[in-house]
């Protein structure tokens, strides 16, 4: 079952020569709620959804008469936050807290009432999100940025799920940013680029991080974004045909080598293409690995076997092989990366990973907050998952001993917190129009 092209521009429509993400039209809350339940049932068929239903009914009535800038009923937003969390396959307490995340701040409902109805676990999550509240943001003030990050990390230390709810909240707000004033759009986009996207990156949640990046670029530099969309779409058909051919060739060779593999092709996301253009001072046509082919196999042994097959099929480009299986990234990411030259002289990248590695790459730390029921029915997070957050403990130690400037410097330096993006984001800011 080889899905050929995964298009990151899905949902983008060309309007007046520009690509725009179609907004979620005025939606019926009941239909949205049904979509949420369907998603939860998909990954946890036996769960009792009565708590989710109760949260929906309470939030629905608590937010009655409240509307967003789009004119939509306010309840649409918390429901989408719940859906984003369900897409990460999180536990129902997190989803319930996502649905209720604005009720204490924006309605007459109290934290005490949430505790009485849903228990202390949900109440603490809602309280954590409420306390983070509206972070005060200024792109030019290091002090403010450091203070925001301190708040975020302290919330994470108490319960990582608070940050997952906050990321889902920000993602839906970014998806509906077109209803804000232009200056507010730029401010939110920069804040997302400086704070939320790097945290999603550090937690390894690529499916949220890549969308936050693309939306940040769209609103902070619309001309650059739309120009890039048009340039990429101009040669879309020939690129898709090229990727299709690679996928078919690779699938055939994997079959012959008796390696069970799922092979997918995709065009890279706008922001990662733009980042390469800026950092390498190149045009779109000069970026040679615009597309990647992903091979998902059953075991680590198969990863290396698949690599051997690939290197026999195509010419590897020297210095472009990375073994993130033997040396995982700090955010737990594992894969083999190799860049190759096709028979027609077109370079492309292949990533090889197991299904478990793929889930960690997509969901990051959220992958370890799936339903883990022990015999007594209580969720448990294994000690090894705690170890994977040792970097967070390191941050908390620094928090106590450093001033804001030093704290930021440590985050961006020794800890490698924003390793992949820190320089790029600063560099990109210099290119803003």
Describe each region flagged by the PLM:
Residues 421:
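Exposed beta-strand and adjacent loop surfaces of beta-rich binding modules
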Residues 1-292, 296-348, 353-412, 424:
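Active-site helical microenvironments for divalent-metal-assisted chemistry
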Residues 426-433:
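Conserved small/polar residues in nucleotide/adenosyl-binding loops
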């Amino acid at each position: 079952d080889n899905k050929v092209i995964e298009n990151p521009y899905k949902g983008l429509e060309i309007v007046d020569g520009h690509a725009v993400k179609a907004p979620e039209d005025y939606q019926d809350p009941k239909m949205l709620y049904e979509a949420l339940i369907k998603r939860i049932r998909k990954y946890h068929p036996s769960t009792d959804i009565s708590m989710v239903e109760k949260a929906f009914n309470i939030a629905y009535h608590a937010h009655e008469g409240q509307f967003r800038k789009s004119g939509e009923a306010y309840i649409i937003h918390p429901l989408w936050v719940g859906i984003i969390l369900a897409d990460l396959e999180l536990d129902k307490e997190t989803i319930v807290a996502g649905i209720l995340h604005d009720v204490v701040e924006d309605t007459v409902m109290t934290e005490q009432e949430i505790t009485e109805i849903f228990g202390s676990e949900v109440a603490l999550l809602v309280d954590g999100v409420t306390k983070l509240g509206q972070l005060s943001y200024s792109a030019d003030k290091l002090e403010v940025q450091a203070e925001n990050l301190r708040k975020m990390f302290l919330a994470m230390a108490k319960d990582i799920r608070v940050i997952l709810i906050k990321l889902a909240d920000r993602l839906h707000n970014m998806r509906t940013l077109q209803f804000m004033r232009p200056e507010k759009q730029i401010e939110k986009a920069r804040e997302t680029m400086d704070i939320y996207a790097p945290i999603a990156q550090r937690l390894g949640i690529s499916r949220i991080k890549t969308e936050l990046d693309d939306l940040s670029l769209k609103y902070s530099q619309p001309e650059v974004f739309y120009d890039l969309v048009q340039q990429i779409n101009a040669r879309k058909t020939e690129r898709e045909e090229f990727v299709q051919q690679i996928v078919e060739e690779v699938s055939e060779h994997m079959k012959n080598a008796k390696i069970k593999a799922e092979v997918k092709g995709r065009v890279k996301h706008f922001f990662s293409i733009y980042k390469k253009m800026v950092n390498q001072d190149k045009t779109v046509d000069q970026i040679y690995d615009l597309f990647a082919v992903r091979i998902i196999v059953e075991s680590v042994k198969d990863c290396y076997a698949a690599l051997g097959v690939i290197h026999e099929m195509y010419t590897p480009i020297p210095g472009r092989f990375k073994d993130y299986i033997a040396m995982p990234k700090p955010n737990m990411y594992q894969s083999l990366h190799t860049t190759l030259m096709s028979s027609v002289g077109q370079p492309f990248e292949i990533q090889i990973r197991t299904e478990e590695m793929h889930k960690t790459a997509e969901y990051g730390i959220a992958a370890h907050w799936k339903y883990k029921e022990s015999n007594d029915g209580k969720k448990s997070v294994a000690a090894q998952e705690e170890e994977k957050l040792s970097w967070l403990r390191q941050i908390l130690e620094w928090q106590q001993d450093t001033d804001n400037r030093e704290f930021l410097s440590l985050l961006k330096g020794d800890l490698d917190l924003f390793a992949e993006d820190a320089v790029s984001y600063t560099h990109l800011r210099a290119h803003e129009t």
